[in-house]
Regions:
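Divalent metal-coordination and catalytic microenvironments
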Residues: 36, 52, 57, 79, ...
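Histidine-rich, glycine-flanked metal-binding segment
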Residues: 26, 38, 43-83
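Metal-coordinating catalytic core of metallo-dependent amide/deamination hydrolases
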Residues: 25, 147-261
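Cleaved targeting-peptide boundary
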Residues: 23-30
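Positively charged n-region of N-terminal signal peptides that target proteins for export
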Residues: 1-5
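Bacterial N-terminal signal peptides
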Residues: 7-21
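Metal-associated gating/positioning segment near the N- to mid-region
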Residues: 80-145, 163-173, 239
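Extracytoplasmic/secreted proteins, especially bacterial periplasmic and envelope-associated proteins
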Residues: 54, 61, 113-120, 134, ...
Length: 261
C-alpha cells in the first residue's frame, strides 16, 4: 500500500465521523485502526485482517499486528470499509447561500456558513477540495491553523469574468460598472471579480495569486447562476484568456474555466 494516501482515512459508514474530526489539523499523535476492510483506491479486492498505523499524517505500517505507539488513538472499525480520503475537484465552500439569503447577509455570515460547509465536507470523507470561485483564503488559513475543522483547501479565489459575464451579479437597479457605485454583494465580498481587457485581467489574476490562489478560475461562457448572460454566449476574447494564462504560468500554475458553450 502506498504511503502517499491522504492522511485522514474516512470510513464510508461514518466510522470516524466523531473520532477523527479535526485530524487534518492535529496529525502529531498516532492512530491505529483495526478490524477494517480497506479499499486502497487501486485494487477491487478489499484488504482484510490488517492493522493500519498513521503517524504524523502518514501511513507508516500495514500488517497483521503493527507496533502501537504510546498514547496512540485506537479505533476498532467493526468490519466497516475504510477508504482513502475523497477529493472534490470542483467545490464552492464560500458559496453556500441562496441568492436571496446571500444578497441580504454580511460577510461575517457568509464566513460562518462556510465553516459549517467545510466540516460537512470532512465528515463526509472529503479530505481535499479544489475551491473554484469564492473568497476562501481565510477559510483555508483557519483550517490549516486548526481553528476550524475542514479539508485541505486549494483556493482559486474569486472567479474572474468580463462585464456582463458569469461573475456579473448586478441587478438592473444598480448603476453601470463604468461609474462609481456600490458593487453587487458577491463582488463586494470578493467572491467574484469583473475584469475587462488584458490589463484588468492581468491585474485580477495577479491579485488572486497574491492572496494565495493555487490556481485561477475564469468564466468564458454563460451560466444559470447569472441572469444577464445566456448560456450560449462566448465570454472573453482570446487575448484576455491568454493574459490570465500568462500570469498564472508566471507563478507555475494554471487556469481553470467555467465553460458552457
Amino acid at each position: 500500500m502506498s504511503r502517499h494516501f491522504l492522511a485522514s482515512l474516512i470510513a464510508t459508514m461514518a466510522l470516524l465521523s466523531h473520532s477523527i474530526s479535526g485530524y487534518t489539523q492535529d496529525t502529531s499523535s498516532a492512530i491505529v485502526i483495526s478490524n477494517a476492510r480497506i479499499f486502497d483506491g487501486v485494487s477491487e479486492q478489499l484488504i482484510e485482517g490488517k492493522q493500519l498505523l498513521i503517524e504524523d499524517g502518514i501511513i507508516t505500517a500495514l500488517s497483521e499486528e503493527v507496533r502501537i505507539p504510546e498514547g496512540a488513538m485506537q479505533i476498532d472499525a467493526g468490519g466497516r470499509v475504510l477508504t482513502p480520503g475523497f477529493i472534490d475537484s470542483h467545490a464552492h465552500l464560500m458559496l453556500q447561500l441562496s441568492f436571496g439569503e446571500g444578497f441580504n447577509s454580511d460577510a461575517y455570515y457568509w464566513a460562518y456558513v462556510s465553516t459549517q460547509a467545510a466540516e460537512i465536507y470532512l465528515q463526509n470523507g472529503f479530505t481535499t477540495v479544489r475551491d473554484v470561485s469564492g473568497n476562501s483564503f481565510s477559510l483555508k488559513k483557519a483550517i490549516d491553523r486548526g481553528i476550524v475543522d475542514g479539508p485541505r483547501v486549494f483556493p482559486s479565489g474569486p472567479m474572474i469574468s468580463q462585464t456582463s459575464g458569469h461573475s456579473d451579479h448586478r441587478t438592473d437597479a444598480q448603476a453601470s460598472a463604468m461609474v462609481a457605485d456600490e458593487p453587487a454583494v458577491p463582488m463586494k465580498y470578493d467572491m467574484v471579480q469583473l475584469a475587462d481587457g488584458r490589463t484588468e485581467v492581468l491585474k485580477a489574476t495577479r491579485e488572486a495569486l497574491r492572496r494565495g490562489a493555487s490556481q485561477i478560475k475564469i468564466a468564458v461562457g454563460g451560466g444559470t447562476g447569472s441572469y444577464a448572460d445566456p448560456l450560449d454566449t462566448t465570454q472573453y476574447t482570446p487575448d484576455e484568456i491568454r493574459a490570465a494564462v500568462e500570469a498564472a504560468e508566471d507563478w507555475n500554475t494554471y487556469v481553470t474555466a467555467h465553460v458552457y458553450n
